[in-house]
A protein has these predicted regions:
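A bilobed periplasmic-binding-protein/Venus flytrap-type ligand-binding module shared by bacterial periplasmic
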Residues: 141-151, 241-257, 419-421
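Secondary-structure end/capping motifs
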Residues: 53, 255-333
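Short, glycine-/small- and polar/acidic-enriched structural segments
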Residues: 37-186, 191-195, 210, 239
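Conserved C-terminal helix/tail region of periplasmic/extracytoplasmic solute-binding proteins
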Residues: 327-363
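A ligand-binding cleft/hinge motif common to bilobed small-molecule-binding domains
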Residues: 110-122, 176, 209-228, 318, ...
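Bacterial signal peptide processing site
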Residues: 31-34
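Pocket-lining segment of extracytoplasmic ligand-binding domains
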Residues: 192, 198-286, 384, 391-400, ...
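C-terminal motif of bacterial Sec signal peptides marking the signal peptidase cleavage site
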Residues: 25-29
């Protein structure tokens, strides 16, 4: 058995999705919710997406920790604050409520953020991106999956097939770009089904959709449940994707201290997640009903998502590139991304640490095992080391995670595509990347997970 490094894993970042198609709904009301009350009591309304777990530091986890309420209580301005947390399935209704003046602060994915900007400008109710929750610099938060027994093995195989996605979401953007690179027309080359994630997942299981392109946490959830397998790793695009926090401009101007209190609380929640990744995963799982193993895949110490409130230039640049995809789909017109981004509040909230955090990059993903009954995971030098441990402790393993050999995207070890190359055992999220590696390395071959375990033991 190869050497095992047994030490608690801790995300190596500085301590401090979801999106769906947006229907341009009519304005239903006016007046900010943060202006409610009798003069001494103010209600702040926060819209979030509990199951879009890339936003937990501005939603599910933040709410459970109570940090925002504590920050508001520490303002000492003689005002009694109440927080109204409103949970939504996608970013679209959050945007609708923000432009109606009913939500003050919201969180959503990159493509819905752009629609949030466009909708706010259209209605004269501008909003601004004020912080980031979680991101992946290569695009690994979005994945295209097929049914477990599907014979589809590449993007080219999707020609003429029914593909479910949520139009206007980051997952839709991944689908469009991936198909374009593969030489498949994203409009006429497939039959696109515009569906909410849960509906698309059901369609995939029922056989009425041949593939599903979705955002965190749906691909990982379906793979974990044995209801899907990965066809395309969004990180193959090598384009950043992220989720962020948006605030109404009038709210930010009227109550800047409240917005800064929220961003300070978000930074605290980020620090908690970094320092207690397993506990955070368990907490989010309890609140959402998602398996903790799936939450950890995305939000864990070496998860697919890196959490950091700073608004990094690379993410802003990616947002600018996303505009063309939305315009081509006739979901928006031109969007002034520079005008939409307003990082002054998060700069004040983070203080001197902001500049250092802004340039920080995530560490490479690592192989991890989550032992049953453990409150910490263990990290391994190589995927082969992890396999050797799993082979000897299979009954004691809650979950095992390995990074894709080419993209770094973390995936479940028993759901990965494995390649044997000499003494090396290499995991891949999708079959196409595994085949590409085999084609470029003489003697390398695809093996089953069972064979990989045997080779490692």
């Amino acid at each position: 058995m190869k050497r095992l490094v047994e030490r608690p894993v801790k995300r190596q970042t500085l301590t401090a999705a979801g999106a769906a198609a947006l229907l341009l709904l009519p304005l239903t009301a006016c007046g900010g919710s943060a202006e409610a009350g009798d003069g001494s009591t103010v209600t702040v309304t926060v819209g979030y997406q509990s199951k879009t777990i890339n936003t937990v530091t501005a939603g599910t986890l933040l709410r459970s920790l109570g940090y925002f309420e504590k920050q508001l209580g520490a303002l000492g301005d003689g005002v009694t604050y109440k927080v109204d947390w409103q949970d939504y399935a996608t970013g679209a209704p959050i945007t609708a409520q923000m432009t109606a003046g009913k939500i003050d602060i919201g969180s959503m994915g990159d493509f819905p953020l752009l629609i949030n900007a466009a909708r706010g400008k259209q209605l004269g109710k501008p909003t601004h991106l004020v912080s980031v929750t979680g991101y992946n610099l290569r695009g690994g938060l979005n994945t295209i999956v097929t049914a477990p027994d599907s014979e589809l093995a590449s993007l080219e195989d999707l020609k003429g097939k029914k593909v479910s996605t949520s139009v206007g979401s980051a997952a839709d953007g991944t689908l469009v770009r991936a198909l374009q690179r593969a030489g498949v027309d994203p409009v006429d080359g497939i039959e696109k089904l515009n569906q909410q994630p849960a509906v698309g997942a059901s369609a995939l299981s029922a056989g009425s959709a041949d593939a599903l392109s979705q955002f965190v946490a749906w691909p990982g959830l379906l793979a974990f449940q044995g209801k899907a397998k990965a066809l395309y790793d969004g990180a193959q695009l090598d384009l950043p994707t992220f989720h962020g926090v948006t605030a109404r401009e009038d709210f930010a101007k009227k109550r800047p201290a409240v917005l800064e209190a929220f961003l300070k609380a978000q930074a605290q929640a980020t620090a908690y997640l970094d320092e207690h990744p397993v506990a955070a995963a368990e907490s989010v799982a309890k609140a959402t009903g998602l398996p903790a193993e799936v939450v950890y895949l995305y939000n864990g110490a070496h998860g697919i998502s890196t959490f950091d409130p700073t608004v990094k230039p690379r993410l802003v640049a990616a947002l600018e590139e996303d505009v063309s995809v939305l315009k081509a789909a006739k979901l928006t017109g031109d969007i002034d991304v520079d005008a939409f981004v307003d990082d002054r509040y998060v700069k004040r909230a983070l203080g001197a640490s902001y500049a250092e955090r802004l340039t920080a990059t995530p560490p490479p993903a690592a192989s991890e095992v989550w032992p049953k009954g453990a409150t910490e995971t263990r990290t391994f030098t190589t995927p082969a080391d992890l396999l050797a441990h799993v082979a000897g402790h299979n009954d004691g393993i809650r979950a095992a995670y390995v990074p894709d050999a080419t993209t770094g995207t973390l995936w479940f070890a028993d759901r990965a595509v494995w390649v044997a190359d000499g003494e090396n055992l290499l995991p891949f999220v999708a079959p196409a990347t595994a085949r590409a590696y085999v084609d470029a390395h003489g003697g390398a071959r695809v093996v089953t997970y069972a064979d990989a375990l045997e080779l490692a033991s």
